[in-house]
């Protein structure tokens, strides 16, 4: 590998939606940072088989639905 071209790879703490914490190595943030997940394998409908709504953080889903609500409708 070429030196000096790869991002820093360090240990971070990941906090899942239910509060479970674990440590992993990542290029995210800096050494010791915490990554708080909004959706994970314990809460995402694709893995739970549920039909629950995904939490709309920052209104992005709402803006998307509003913008494309009439798309492909006759």
From Swiss-Prot:
GO terms for biological process: translation. Coiled coil: none annotated. One of its GO terms (molecular function) is structural constituent of ribosome. One of its GO terms (cellular component) is ribosome. Keywords: Ribonucleoprotein, Ribosomal protein, RNA-binding, rRNA-binding. InterPro entries: Ribosomal_bL28/bL31-like_sf, Ribosomal_bL31, Ribosomal_bL31_A, Ribosomal_bL31_sf. Signal peptide: none annotated. The keyword DNA-binding does not apply. PANTHER family: 50S RIBOSOMAL PROTEIN L31, CHLOROPLASTIC, LARGE RIBOSOMAL SUBUNIT PROTEIN BL31A. Part of the 50S ribosomal subunit. Belongs to the bacterial ribosomal protein bL31 family. Type A subfamily. Binds the 23S rRNA. This is Large ribosomal subunit protein bL31. It comes from Afipia carboxidovorans (strain ATCC 49405 / DSM 1227 / KCTC 32145 / OM5) (Oligotropha carboxidovorans). The gene is rpmE.
């Amino acid at each position: 590998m070429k030196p000096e071209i790869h991002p820093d790879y360090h240990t971070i703490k990941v906090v899942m939606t239910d509060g479970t914490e674990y440590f992993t190595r990542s290029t995210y943030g800096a050494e010791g940072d915490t990554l708080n997940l909004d959706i994970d394998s314990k809460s995402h409908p694709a893995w739970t088989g549920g039909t629950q709504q995904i939490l709309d953080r920052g209104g992005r889903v709402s803006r998307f639905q509003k913008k494309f609500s009439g798309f492909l409708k006759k």
